[in-house]
Amino acid sequence: MGNYRWPSKLSKLSLRAKQTNLYRVILIAILCVTFYFVGVWQHSGRGISRSSISNHELTSVPCTFPHQTTPILNFASRHTAPDLPPTITDARVVQIPSCGVEFSEYTPCEFVNRSLNFPRERLIYRERHCPEKHEIVRCRIPAPYGYSLPFRWPESRDVAWFANVPHTELTVEKKNQNWVRYEKDRFLFPGGGTMFPRGADAYIDEIGRLINLKDGSIRTAIDTGCGVASFGAYLMSRNIVTMSFAPRDTHEAQVQFALERGVPAIIGVLASIRLPFPARAFDIAHCSRCLIPWGQYNGTYLIEVDRVLRPGGYWILSGPPINWQRHWKGWERTRDDLNSEQSQIERVARSLCWRKLVQREDLAVWQKPTNHVHCKRNRIALGRPPFCHRTLPNQGWYTKLETCLTPLPEVTGSEIKEVAGGQLARWPERLNALPPRIKSGSLEGITEDEFVSNTEKWQRRVSYYKKYDQQLAETGRYRNFLDMNAHLGGFASALVDDPVWVMNVVPVEASVNTLGVIYERGLIGTYQNWCEAMSTYPRTYDFIHADSVFSLYKDRCDMEDILLEMDRILRPKGSVIIRDDIDVLTKVKKITDAMQWEGRIGDHENGPLEREKILFLVKEYWTAPAPDQSSDP
């Protein structure tokens, strides 16, 4: 007991330190376990995480696309392609201003003030004369105050809102010809015309007694000097689609009326350049008092009709000078003058190897030969015009008119009935039958297999579009369609059962000129350079489709100018679908945001791994202001 030692002060302090460290270890362990279970609880979805707060903020933003069925794809902040411009936040997007109300019917390439600088001879001043780069108007064209969505087809054939085309000139100048009447807040189209006082239906029935309009052999027509396009409007019920054209002149609203009625039409004139169509495009050509001097200038204008007329096609003429013996007093012309004019026309038609089928009362019909076998043999006897050499018959963009005859493709035999270029199927089989230009191998790289697969591809794509856009899927919501890069016309062919018509554009920059194939399918279209404005009025189309257009025009012209032209020709509340590489669409959407279009980017129909995406857009409704109000929406 005497050897026992009490613990020293130092040993007591050491014991207390060990106890404190133990407590700390236990406390840290408890906290770690607690944080672990809290983390598990949050990841299970029962907690409020930062991501869930962020999602709540996103979903609270209102969206005006009730038909949206797939997620919006947003590449603006995360896409890092080297050629993209710096990201612009929504707060910094500069809106493209609206134009003044004086631009509400602006047609850039048929602008009256500019056209007066060109020769009046042969109406050259009424041809396309587009602005220079420094003259391009870079603002959004307003609809007139009070603009309303057009009536739906077929009601639109007979009625249009006055506020949409606020012109009464035709109701005065053509009052006795029953073109158009103005009643209260709308225009009525009785279907009359200068040469069809009993109406367009009765007039077409008269033509049908001379040539067969019912068996599907006649599908495409061209109407020169169309007026308000009643001829084309009433042919639609007979499954004949008509390209109507007229110049922008004192009857300044005639083509605009046609488009408002839901009838295909463009601004155009026969003057010094070819029509913007390929050779052998139309089954019939029509002129009802169109006032074109067919027999003058060495028959140049009839030679151009011959170029675009299909082998075996018909040219129909009514009005001066046909039946001049009866009408010469009413036309306020002399008998000798009218007789001379008809003699000139007859002489030119014979020189083209046309055969006059019939002249009955106010109608005359000529037929183009199915081939040029006999025409070439008789060329020495006929004399002028000679056959063209070293010319491209399908060129139709700023190509000068010629006084030579466009030769038809060679035929294998000497039969007069053998169709040069190949016999076309009758409508509706014509739509999906192999076009002769593909069958002959004249289009490089386009085969029968590609044609079939292209048709099937666009059937799938249009079905996919309709799942995204309920307005497109709604029968009758849209009438006037534009395909800016139509290729083989697959987009239009997929819509053939809908009550719509499609203007199929083949850009002049396209690697292969396929517009002839489009016409051989029984569809219509035109050539166009999208660095320039289209020859049409503002608010022409309900729907615009642009497949790879901006990739095609990269480094050719300003993307903003193309989009502003699309804005000009698109109706308020109209829709646009743009397909292109995602880098391109990202740039496009920044501009359409500045144009105050509403849009979203969706996946390719084959899935999200495709670089090509689809931009769905809607143009907002806005108009020119009421008096003393700002024009910007």
UniProtKB/Swiss-Prot annotation:
It is found in: Golgi apparatus membrane. It holds the Pfam family Methyltransf_29. One of its GO terms (molecular function) is methyltransferase activity. The chain crosses the membrane at residues 25-45. Residues 46-633 are lumenal. Glycans are attached at residues 113, 298. GO terms for biological process: methylation. It is a single-pass type II membrane protein. Keywords: Glycoprotein, Golgi apparatus, Membrane, Methyltransferase, Signal-anchor, Transferase, Transmembrane, Transmembrane helix. Its main location: Golgi. The keyword DNA-binding does not apply. Residues 1-24 are cytoplasmic. GO terms for cellular component: cytosol; endosome; Golgi apparatus; Golgi membrane; trans-Golgi network. It comes from the Eukaryota. Its EC number is 2.1.1.-. InterPro entries: Put_SAM_MeTrfase, SAM-dependent_MTases_sf. Belongs to the methyltransferase superfamily. PANTHER family: METHYLTRANSFERASE PMT15-RELATED, SAM-DEPENDENT METHYLTRANSFERASE. This is Probable methyltransferase PMT15. It comes from Arabidopsis thaliana (Mouse-ear cress).
